[in-house]
Amino acid sequence: MNTDESDLVLLRAETRVLGIQTKLHRWARDDPDRRFDDLFNLVADPAFLLVAWDRVRGNRGAKTAGVDGATAASIVAGVGVGVFLDDLRSALRDRSFRPLPVRERMIPKSGGKLRRLGIATVTDRVVQASLKLVLEPIFEADFLPCSYGFRPKRRAHDAVAELWYLTSKPREYEWIVEGDIKACFDEISHPALMCRVGRRVGDSRVLGLVKAFLKAGILGEDKALRETNAGTPQGSILSPLLSNVALSALDDYVAGLPGGPRSTTVERARRRRHGQPNYRLVRYADDWCLVIKGTREHAEALREEIAGVLSTMGLRLSEEKTLITHIEEGLDFLGWRIQRHRKRGTSRHYVYTYPAKKSLRSVMLKVKTLCRQIGVQQSLGDLLRRLNPAVRGWCAYFRPGSSSATFAYLGHRVWSTVWRWLRRKHRRSTWKDLRRQYCSGGWWPVIGETALFDPAKVGTTRYRYRGSIIPSPWSATAQETTRVAAGLMESPVH
C-alpha cells in the first residue's frame, strides 16, 4: 500500500471514529444516568485500533521501548503495521491479551526531587489509546467546566483566565484555598476509581481491561517487579483521563454546595446579604484553587470538608502546602503569579497575571545549563539553535499576561549569559573585537541570519476567559469537516 492509499485509509478510519465518538458524547450528554454496555467491540474495532496506532506512533515517546524492547519503528520494520494490528485485535477478542508491567523511569523535577514515569509497551499503548478514544467522549459529557487539565480544546491559559476573572471586579472572590494533593497519581484508590468508571461503563470486558492496566505492575530501575495496588502510572495514555474521573468527585462536590457554581445569581446575592459564602473551583489536573467570596474562616472550614471528599478517593491533602491566601497577597498557579496590585499612577487596584518568580528562575537555569552543555569549542550558531527555541517557547506561554517587565529582565539575563559564553570562547579578544565579529558593531549577538532571541520584543496579549463556550471536539461541524476531507461528502458551495 503506497503512502497516498494508507493516508486515505487512515482518514476514513478517523472519520468513522469521530462519528461514533460524536454519538457516544451526545447519548451521554442527553442521559446523565445512561450506562454503556457494549463498548468492547469498539475498542477492538479496526478503525479505532488504526487511529490509536497512528497516535502512538506520532507521539514523541514512540522511540522509547517498554519492558519488551519493542518500539514503533521496530514493529513497522518487523511484522508490519497490518499484521501487528490484526494480531492485537485477535488477542483482544479471544481475551488472551494481557498488559505487561510498565518500565520505571525516574526523571528530575524542581527542588531536586524525582518524578516516576511508567513506560508501557507499544502494544499496551495502542490498546490504552483505543480505550481512551471510546471512553473520553462519554466522560467528557460529565466533566464540569471548572476542570481544564488533559481535556480536549482546553489549556492552562483557560484555567488562569478563569481564576483572574473570578478574583477581579465585580466578582471579587478574594480568599483562595491553594490545593496540594500528596502524590495524587500514586495514591488514587483503585476500588473507588473503578466505582466511578462503572457508573458510566457497564461492559465488564472494558472494565476488566481498565483494571488490568491499573494492576499491571511496575518493573523498577533495579529490575524488581512491584505490584500497583493504588494510583495510575504517570506517563500512561489512560492516566490523565482516569485521574480526571477520580478528581471529578471534588468538582461535583463543590458544584453541589449552596453558593457553588450551580447557584443562581439571586441565590448568591441573598447568601452574601446574610453573611454566607459563595464558592468556585478552578482545577487543572491535580492543581486546583478554591476561591471564596466570604471570610478566611469560611475558607478554613471548606478546606476540612474537601480533605474528607478527597479521602474517599484515597487521596490526602498536604497540610503544609495547602494554603489559604488572600488575593492581595497573591498566589502562584500553573507557573503564573496572580495578585491584586495598585495600578501605577492611580489609586485603583486590579488583579494582574504575570510569570511567577519560580518560572523565571527555571528558564534562566535552562539558559545557563544550555550554555554549559554547548561547549565553547562549538559555534555561536550551535548555541543559538538550542537556546532560541527554549526561550521563545517560554515567552509564548507567558505572552497572554502582564509580562513585559519580566520579558525585558529575561532578555538582559539571556544577553549577559551568552556574552559570558563568548568571552570564554575568545579569552584574548576585546569587547570591540567580539562586537565586530558577532554583533556587526552593535551589542546583540547574531550569526548569519540567526540572531539571539530577544524576549523584550515579544508583545503581550490578554487571554480572555471563555467560560462555557469552549467548543467540543465532537460537534456536528467537526464531524462534517472530517467527512469532507475524507471524501465522504461534498463540500458545501458558498
Predicted features, each with a name:
Residues 1-494:
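Non-catalytic terminal/accessory segments
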